[in-house]
């Protein structure tokens, strides 16, 4: 692995990586290996801290992996950044609040050196899998307002969850 090669070649470096929360990160002290190789920050596309929403996104992530990985990083001193999305089709306001509260009510996470998070609004872009079958996500209408004729994305109407305006 990249981390093992850095250690093997005795390269003295600090580095940042972008990862997905995966069960394999929790095996064989892999996070510790990352730290020993110089990793000091990991950036994760968490997207949501709600299992139903993660499943709808087809992320293939379990919340327990998020918790366990975060705990391991905090224990070792690896800073983390979480990208979060709100307004994914079918997502409800209480589900968005699960993500917000995961961060705001987790004092240990907030106090961990270098922690950061950003919450961005979901943008349905042209060519995304949702565009091919919008009804699967409760989307009844996709459109681009005339004043956004150069937009790469869509505005949409939905029968489930929050609208794109919400």
Mark where each language-model region is.
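Alpha-helix termini
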Residues: 7, 105-114
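Hydrophobic, well-ordered secondary-structure elements that form the walls
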Residues: 44, 82, 103, 117
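Catalytic cores of alpha/beta
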Residues: 29-30, 89-106, 131
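Flexible glycine/acidic-rich beta-alpha junction loops that bind and position SAM and/or redox cofactors
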Residues: 52-57, 86-94, 110-165
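Conserved SAM/AdoMet-binding glycine-rich loop
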Residues: 1-80, 91
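Soluble or luminal CAZymes and related metallo-dependent hydrolases
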Residues: 26, 65, 95-98, 166
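Structural beta-sheet core signal
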Residues: 17, 82-84, 119
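Short acidic (Asp/Glu) and glycine-rich catalytic loops that position anionic groups and cofactors
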Residues: 11, 78-83, 99-100, 147-156
């Amino acid at each position: 692995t990249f981390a093992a090669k850095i250690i093997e070649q005795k390269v003295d470096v600090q580095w940042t990586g972008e990862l997905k929360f995966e069960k394999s990160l929790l095996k064989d002290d892999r996070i510790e290996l990352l730290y020993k190789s110089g990793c000091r920050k990991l950036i994760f596309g968490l997207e949501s801290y709600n299992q139903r929403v993660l499943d709808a996104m087809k992320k293939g992530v379990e919340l327990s992996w998020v918790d366990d990985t975060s705990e391991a990083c905090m224990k070792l001193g690896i800073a983390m950044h979480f990208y979060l999305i709100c307004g994914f089709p079918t997502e409800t306001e209480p589900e968005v609040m699960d993500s917000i509260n995961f961060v705001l009510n987790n004092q240990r996470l907030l106090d961990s050196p270098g922690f950061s998070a950003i919450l961005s609004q979901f943008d349905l872009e042209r060519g995304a899998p949702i565009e091919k079958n919008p009804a699967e996500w409760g989307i009844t209408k996709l459109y681009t307002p005339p004043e956004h004729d150069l937009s790469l994305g869509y505005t949409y109407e939905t029968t489930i969850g929050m609208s794109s305006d919400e």
